Design a protein with these regions (language model features):
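N-terminal intrinsically disordered, cationic/polar leader segments
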Residues: 1-55, 62-65, 74-113
């Protein structure tokens, strides 16, 4: 069976919420691995992946057709902006990675509720 077949099977059995949870779990795991190692390339990759995730959420929440309540959308957009700013500080060595992990875990808690 090809990789595409597995992806199709996975997409048909997961709800959008489960897909979002899985993606947050993968990104958060990558961020947590960076705490254990001191490799800058791993840190840069994990931070970039996390920023892309949040940028996608921000873009989706900016769309008029998004069905989330306006206050929720505004909160996600605010978090995405914070994630971007904090990520830059982490990459410059001016901040720790833990707050990014904590925010992602909070989102995961909400998705699993």
């Amino acid at each position: 069976m090809s990789l595409h077949s597995y992806q199709v099977a996975q997409n048909t059995t997961e709800t959008p919420r489960q897909t979002e949870y899985r993606l947050f779990a993968q990104v958060t795991r990558a961020l947590m691995e960076c705490q254990k190692e001191s490799a800058n390339s791993s840190l840069s990759k994990a931070i970039h992946w996390n920023r892309r995730l949040w940028l996608a959420l921000q873009a989706d929440c900016s769309q008029d057709h998004n069905v989330l309540p306006e206050a929720t959308r505004a909160g996600i957009i605010s978090l995405a902006i914070w994630v971007d700013k904090h990520s830059r500080k982490v990459l410059r060595g001016e901040a720790k990675i833990e707050p990014l992990i904590d925010v992602n875990r909070s989102i995961m808690d909400g998705l699993s509720a």
